[in-house]
Regions:
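Positively charged n-region of N-terminal signal peptides that target proteins for export
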Residues: 1-5
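Bacterial N-terminal signal peptides
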Residues: 7-16
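Sec/Tat signal peptide C-region and signal peptidase I cleavage site
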Residues: 18-22
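Flexible, processing/modification-adjacent segments and terminal tails
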Residues: 23-38, 48, 56, 65, ...
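Extended beta-sheet lipid-handling architectures
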Residues: 43-46, 57-59, 74, 178-180, ...
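Sequence/structural signature of outer-membrane beta-barrel proteins
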Residues: 51-53, 183
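Gly/Pro-enriched, hydrophobic low-complexity segments
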Residues: 116-230
Length: 234
């Protein structure tokens, strides 16, 4: 494992030429974290859409609860409770959990949708971490993550795309799009469904890898108003 880690570290260091230096990468990631850490908790209303070949889930209204640093829960209005049960996460804060126990490595500059983004790779220092590497595409001017690609041991590689609006100053997106390979399927943390209505997943026997898509569009946030820990129980 140490040999693999060293190889990855050397590789991403070669990508840094012409972009950020390591100290700048650390400072940029700190700015992103500091912005996210302004949010101690929130309750948000939104709409959840899914496009997964083996699961039939209707578009629905949801309430999202978050409490710093890593408590996250989604509740649907139609009786289906969506609770954290491990796996991947649609919550950006989860990438920075662990008190900064990672190495930030600069990996160049890219242009995406006409916007220049700094690329930073986060390598967890703990060999017990499920995350192998996260690649962040950061809007340096506004300290916002526009895209994140994360490779895990348990659930393969997944991608998060984020769009921002009036809550950008808090680092909170108006829209999150979560893309993953259904062959390595494990629902994101906060999106493991309890089928309280009796509806079960519809599975597809096709073994060809397919992309799953989960989209959350936020209507509003109530930020730093206090949320009881009991909300995240059960």
């Amino acid at each position: 494992m140490k040999v693999i880690y060293t190889t990855v570290l050397l590789l991403v260091n070669t990508l840094a030429a012409g972009g950020l230096v390591a100290q700048d990468a650390d400072a940029l990631v700190k700015r992103v974290r500091d912005k996210l850490n302004m949010v101690k908790d929130y309750e948000a209303e939104g709409v959840l859409k899914t496009n997964v070949s083996f699961m039939k889930v209707p578009e629905s209204s949801i309430t999202v609860y978050y409490k710093n640093p890593d408590k996250f829960k989604i509740k649907k209005k139609d009786g289906i409770s969506v609770v954290p049960k491990g796996g991947m996460s649609v919550n950006m804060n989860s990438l920075f959990a662990g008190n900064g126990e990672y190495t930030a490595v600069p990996a160049g500059i890219v242009n995406q949708n006409g916007q220049q983004l700094s690329v930073v790779k986060l390598l967890p220092l703990s060999e017990a971490s499920d995350i192998v590497v996260s690649t962040l595409y950061i809007d340096e001017k506004n300290a916002l993550v526009r895209k994140a690609i994360t490779t895990t041991r348990e659930s393969g590689t997944y991608e998060i795309e984020l769009s921002y609006g009036k809550f950008a100053k808090w680092g909170l997106p108006d829209k999150v799009v979560f893309l993953f390979n259904t062959q390595n399927y494990k629902l994101p943390k906060g999106l493991a469904f309890d089928y309280d209505t009796g509806e079960k997943p519809v599975y597809n026997d096709n073994t060809v890898p397919q992309k799953g898509r989960v989209e959350i569009s936020y209507k509003n946030y109530r930020i730093n108003k206090g949320i009881s820990a009991s909300v995240f129980e059960g």
